[in-house]
């Protein structure tokens, strides 16, 4: 019964993403505004995170970020649908985008050098990844969905352009890819629990931060780059950058990476996925997200 209902919803989803892009954006903003008016836990998480991360902003400035973030969240259904259901040709024809720094990635790929490509959780991360994968050979890491049926939809959608997807809990797959000269997308900016993490500052607050990246880089001998994404009006911008983080220890490396992600978020704070409980393991999910 659940799968039957889900199949109907997926069919409806595939239909609405056939709408012209301008109409999608209009309906997305309408959905976002309705979400903004509603009382739900994701709105609460977003509001709490923005308050924690921008203590120096006045309440009106934080409110604007929060409101715009929730309204933009309404577009996720369309951006993700485009990423999972559209063809490469249709995306190239209908979605304005620009990739800066692609040559940095292509340089390593031509040399058959593995690349751990860090990125942050933007609201449009599925579309970001799809567009990059249209233009370069990319592999990904994911958290499996609880629904087996939806997991198949998610995986098939991501594999439209990506060459492979690995479960984030099974590092052996993407470690092998990196050793074999592949490029793997990797987002370290969520709370995956304290057991596999270190407490490292994020916006000046202790946050459970995955400690694996430097170990993976050292073990595989791969290089690393950073992908930052944001909108300039209707054009999606993807910047491929080559930062340098301290290799002295996993903690110092991740502190540098967290600060780098912070700086990118501050440029377009309304486009970040604030709906995740980033500080649940360190500040207490029952205490601050209740």
Where would I find each of the regions flagged by the language model?
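Short, flexible loop segments at the rims of nucleotide/cofactor-binding pockets, characterized by
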Residues: 91-97, 143, 160-165, 202-204, ...
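Catalytic core of membrane glycerolipid acyltransferases/transacylases, capturing the structured
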Residues: 111-168, 194-196, 206
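Short, structured helix-loop boundary elements
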Residues: 63, 151, 251-254
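Membrane-anchoring hydrophobic helices of lipid-metabolizing enzymes
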Residues: 1-116, 153-156
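Surface-exposed charge patches
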Residues: 48, 130, 156, 215, ...
